[in-house]
Amino acid sequence: MDFFSRVPLYDELSGLSQPETKCKLEEFTFSNFLKARRVREFLRAHAVAKLPAMRYVYVYYLFSRIGDYIGDDTVLAIFGEFMGVSDAGKARGEGDGESDVHGEGEEEGDGGGEAEPGVGPDIPEVYRVCECLPVRTKCRISLAIEAITRGQYENNLWEIFRDGIISSSKFYHAVRQQNSSKKLFQPWPIVNNYYPLSPLAFGLRCEDAVKTLLAEFVCGRKEVMCDVGFLQSPKDGIFGVSLDMCANVSVGRDNLLEFRADAEIYEIKCRFKYNYSKIECDPLYQKYVSLYNSPSKTTLIRFLSGINRPAVEYVPPGKLPTKNDFLLTSDRDWDLSPKRKRNLTPAHKSLYDCLRANEHASSQVLILSDPSETEGKIDIKARFDVDVFINPEHSYFYQILLQYKVVKNYIQYHSSPGLGSLKTFIVSGFFRKRNHSDPLECSIGGRGTLDSACEIPVLLILTPVYIPHCVVTESLKKASQYWNQSAEEEFSHPPWVSSSLFADGDMTP
């Protein structure tokens, strides 16, 4: 697909089936934009082209092509405030409908990205505008993208915007400078297995149930948002996140999210291996019965110990945790199978800072009532705290770190001033398989319902996550180096992202 074609996209896609249309739209990626002939000419002539300016240039030309097709002109209207042209959508070059994307080694003229006379702003002009966009305007553009991409994996545009982005799932690998399958540009397509018994389908079903549980029993009267689209990092254009759920956030009259200063982020984890059956021969069920009848730290430890790699690792103070489990504790009661641990050293300074920030945090445990005993009503049976905290060596910690950074930028540069501070949580959901004794229809609290196809929730562990400022800035700089390295490997004239983008701003929780 040509980013600069003057042929309306509706006409180009006319007559195509839905799968064919989806494939065509998926060609409008940041990678293909950087490989377009006119863009390569511009990058070759302007060796100092940087991000986030080039990312916003891409966004401008993308919505010049797809805005009318998707029936949303919000993004172009924001650009139009700065372009000085009557129609911000007239950025398409003269073309005959052929693709403007070519291989890196093809011969080409040195036009510097200029458009044909009378067509609209050329690439250098758009780049100059994007270089000077105020951060608040970048936030508005990025929030408009979020609104358009709600639905996440069910939304075709959501996957398009993830190209060239270090997302939450890729951030850990970027910080650790690992060469893995987490490719940033033209990534391998995500193969989603929605077979009902697959771990992915299980996780999606249970995630929706956990959102309802949190809204009913944790968030109370707070405004919650359970359908958040792609949130691009407005200041740098190389990071992006898709939140599972957030609280103290609202949707304004312009359909843009408004994060309050005391917003809350919830990252939900429902592991398939925690699922068990309500039958006598399932050893995990026997331990759950003890937990259900006598809710306490002791019965919780016994229940979790029945799971292979049971989420919580015992680590004495001054020792190095492994990367196996995403929760830690220094409470000796959890040390059921003593193992030797390596000592923390000065080389582990960032890890030490993270451990010190989180080691005194407590997790809240919610034991849920069994709907087979309560006529289908799921409520809180017991609530207590345990000395369990996040493992900063685990990839989940870095997922939350990036979510914190992106949302914090929106609070800093777009939200109205207010009291409070951004909070982050990781929520561990435990479920059991449905039994013949379970009602088909179950209610959650006073307003929520449980999907009849979903397993039965039995337990939630709510863990606060604290992120030191020094670890945020260090991680972002390392990840930006990874982005630059990946771009140099992919493109002959890549745009550049400066580490100075991450040197300012109050990032302290």
From Swiss-Prot:
Subcellular location: Host nucleus; Host cytoplasm
GO cellular component, as recorded: host cell cytoplasm; host cell nucleus
GO annotation (BP), single: symbiont-mediated suppression of host gene expression
Amino acid composition bias (Basic and acidic residues), ranges on this chain: 90-104
Enzyme Commission number, as recorded: 3.1.-.-
Region: Disordered, residue numbers: 90-120
Class of this enzyme: hydrolase
Intrachain disulfide bonds: none
Principal location listed in the UniProt entry: host cell
Site (Required for function): E207, D244, E267, K269
Any Pfam family: Viral_alk_exo
Keywords: Decay of host mRNAs by virus, Early protein, Endonuclease, Eukaryotic host gene expression shutoff by virus, Exonuclease, Host cytoplasm, Host gene expression shutoff by virus, Host mRNA suppression by virus, Host nucleus, Host-virus interaction, Hydrolase, Nuclease, RNA-binding
UniProt GO molecular function: DNA binding; endonuclease activity; exonuclease activity; RNA binding
Entries under InterPro entries matching the protein: Herpes_alk_exo (IPR001616), Restrct_endonuc-II-like (IPR011335), Viral_alk_exo (IPR034720)
HAMAP family found in the cross-reference section: HSV_AN
Function recorded in the entry: Plays a role in processing non linear or branched viral DNA intermediates in order to promote the production of mature packaged unit-length linear progeny viral DNA molecules. Exhibits endonuclease and exonuclease activities and accepts both double-stranded and single-stranded DNA as substrate. Exonuclease digestion of DNA is in the 5'-> 3' direction and the products are 5'-monophosphate nucleosides. Additionally, forms a recombinase with the major DNA-binding protein, which displays strand exchange activity.
Subunit (UniProt): Forms a complex with the DNA polymerase, the DNA polymerase processivity factor, and the major DNA binding protein.
The family this protein is said to belong to: Belongs to the herpesviridae alkaline nuclease family.
Protein name per Swiss-Prot or TrEMBL: Shutoff alkaline exonuclease
UniProt source species: Equine herpesvirus 2 (strain 86/87)
Gene name in the database record: 37
